[in-house]
Amino acid sequence: MDAMIKALSPRYPTFEIAFLRFAFGMVGAVAYWMWTRSGWPTRETTLYNGLRAVLGVLTATSFFFALSLLPLADAIALSFISPALTALMGAMILGERLDWRIAVALAAGFLGMLLIVGGKLGSAGFGTEALIGAAAVLFSALVYSLNIILLRHRATRDPLAQIILFQNVGAGLILLLPALWVWVTPTLADLVQFAILGTLGVVAHTMLAHAFARVEAAKLAPIAYVTLIWGVLFGFLFFAEVPGLATFAGAALIVVGTFITQRR
């Protein structure tokens, strides 16, 4: 998804990309909600998941904007302060246990992120655009962590279909006016990409909600670091972004951290 968004970002404004991602996601979300016959949400469900929709919009727009300014692997690497924040917030807010294996895994993943950032961003020259992009990523990581904690809180209380419905329909409605303000008419080929993007978003969010309903946030958080491996690969294949030794060293730490949690 991130690679597709980065490819679309030179041609379309951030608000439009985010809107179309959620707009196409609405189709799958509504269909899933109707198929499961989950019923109408309660007032409590509406309140919490409405807040999640707002957090989702802030996360998406800030990270999509960052992708237009930073190499793919760098943007993903910076965003991976989020798993550490998620695990810590899970312990502080939800009372989840933070044992030594998870702490070591988080530390390994965070050190891996620092290696990649220091190696790639440092060598490229940290200019104004990169600084703005990095700030946008860090903001998105903070908001995303709050969103994940709220998802963990609601995933055991609300029907999965309602969670998916709010995340897509709510975010789409919030983004409608900003997207129209900066609208650039998409080509047919790009509309197909947006449709794929929306579908992938719904599938990914469904799997994420399903996982957080069954596993503590702290244990799942380090697994997200594996995404960085794909970011490096797609950055190389589609954007000619060649990773350096620091990237591979950081990726190795990330993988080690992920396997530690699985041996818990």
Language-model region placement:
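Helix-helix packing/entry segments at the starts of transmembrane helices
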Residues: I76-I81, R154-G170, H205-F236, R263-R264
